Amino acid sequence: MKYNEQEVDRRRTFAIVSHPDAGKTTITEKLLLFGGAIQQAGEVRARKAARHATSDWMEMEKQRGISVTSSVMKFTYRDYEVNLLDTPGHNDFSEDTYRVLTAVDSALMVIDSVKGVESQTIKLLDVCRLRHTPIMTFINKLDREGRDPFELIDEIEKVLRIQCAPMTWPIGMGKRFRGTYHLYTKELVIFDAEAERGTGGVISMTGLDDPQLDELLGSQADELRADVELLEGAAHPFEEEAYHAGLQTPVFFGSAINTFGVQQLLDTFVDHAPAPLPREAVSRTVSPYEEPFTAFAFKIQANMDPAHRDRIAFFRICSGKFTRGMKVRHVRLGREVAINNATIFMAQDRTHVDEAFPGDIIGIHNHGTIKIGDTFTLGEDIKFTGIPNFAPEHFRRVRLLDPLKSKALEKGLTQLAEEGTTQVFRPLMGADWVVGAVGLLQFDVVMHRLEHEYNVKATYEPVSYVTARWVTGEKKKVEEFQKKEVMNCYIDGEGDLAYLAGSQWRLDNTMDNWKDLTFHATREHS
């Protein structure tokens, strides 16, 4: 018998991915609106009134209007429990986004109809493809003059190398935007920017020959008929199996800022998106229908509540049932812990959770003992795979302005590195820390947070490193390597040896000279 079958099958856990400014935060809020999780969308337009978007809660995000950290939100829709993970909307945060995508079962891609496929979308889709993540697509901003919908579909197929299966089709755009026609339910949804939730009515049609179509749309009715005829000949029909395999993306059109088209997307999402999927571990595959509890940490966030100076570890439940107060085994440390204060999130608002099931994301207070990739079980030594650290591409040396703050600097850098958006390196020789990041914006984030959350003022100095490699091998050889290459050897935040190279040539040369050692470009979270 499948354990918790009903609870598992009604869960949907997904992330929203897009290029900055495609409307990701807006669609997040509209989904929460339909789920009854918020009463009023804090749209970006209302930011001047200091009602910042619900999911962008960190100070720096509020200033810049981009999601810098990924937050977790939960809502109920049509008896489905939906866990929505917002991902960073800035291209410097690919590493954090990658880890968020390890915790979800599917993704929603938001594309700006004016701009089409953008660079960040391509990167994010590559990450989804690595994991065969099923993707649904929402083409946004139909209330503006955008690109031809056929052209957009063609671009998605060619650039992102994924089949498109249009589910709804737009009638006009910009000033001529009248609504969408659902190709499968035959419903016509009329757009009305003044109406509540952007919808002037949902009209069931017998098909495209229905005379109501001409009455409502006038000359645009024939345009719609011609478009649909073309689609029937050229577009891919929706196939759930191809969607689940990550080979096909169902496509919806709408205007998130007007809440238009969002409900059609949400209905299809809960009906067709996968329920919690099995998870790969080192020793075996873990089914969501197993009775023993398992979960892994995919994200750590410091100072979510400045009043409490707290750190929260986000866990994805993979199997079994979580109940408040239960004792679990922290596999890496080999010790038993009781979880009394797990929380679920609605962006910054959090509530204590009494029970949770596979697919759910829970937050657990972390006093420095939980690291990304850690597993909690009821006793079995399981380690889930595929949660990596990437080698940084940018480096800065940190110079402290007040020498008396060195302990606070160490604490700040270590805690921020635990979140996984930056990495810290302590030299084997010398005292100055080096911060490594996959993207440049992360350096600003570290400085800002050191000052505002740890009361540490520091500056950066350029440092001539271009990449890092983690070094492993026989103990004697590693010790010999450390002596010979001491100027380039560092210890990372996890206590592992890293070699920082000043050029690709230098790295290649060092690897040639030390063939007995292994140089790793990524490191699994241990």
From Swiss-Prot:
The protein's GO terms of the molecular function aspect are: GTP binding; GTPase activity; translation release factor activity, codon nonspecific; translation release factor activity, codon specific
Give yes or no: UniProt keyword Nucleotide-binding.
yes
Query: What GO biological process terms does the UniProt entry carry, in alphabetical order?
Result: regulation of translational termination; translational termination
CDD domains found in the cross-reference section: RF3, RF3_II, RF3_III
Report if keyword Zinc is assigned: no
Supply the PROSITE patterns for this chain: G_TR_1, G_TR_2
Domain tr-type G: residue ranges: 9-277
Q: Name one GO cellular component term.
A: cytosol
PANTHER family for the chain? PEPTIDE CHAIN RELEASE FACTOR RF3
By sequence similarity, the record places it as follows:
Belongs to the TRAFAC class translation factor GTPase superfamily. Classic translation factor GTPase family. PrfC subfamily.
Function per UniProt = Increases the formation of ribosomal termination complexes and stimulates activities of RF-1 and RF-2. It binds guanine nucleotides and has strong preference for UGA stop codons. It may interact directly with the ribosome. The stimulation of RF-1 and RF-2 is significantly reduced by GTP and GDP, but not by GMP.
What protein am I looking at?
A: Peptide chain release factor 3
Q: What's the source species for this entry? A: Geobacter sulfurreducens (strain ATCC 51573 / DSM 12127 / PCA)
The protein's gene is named prfC
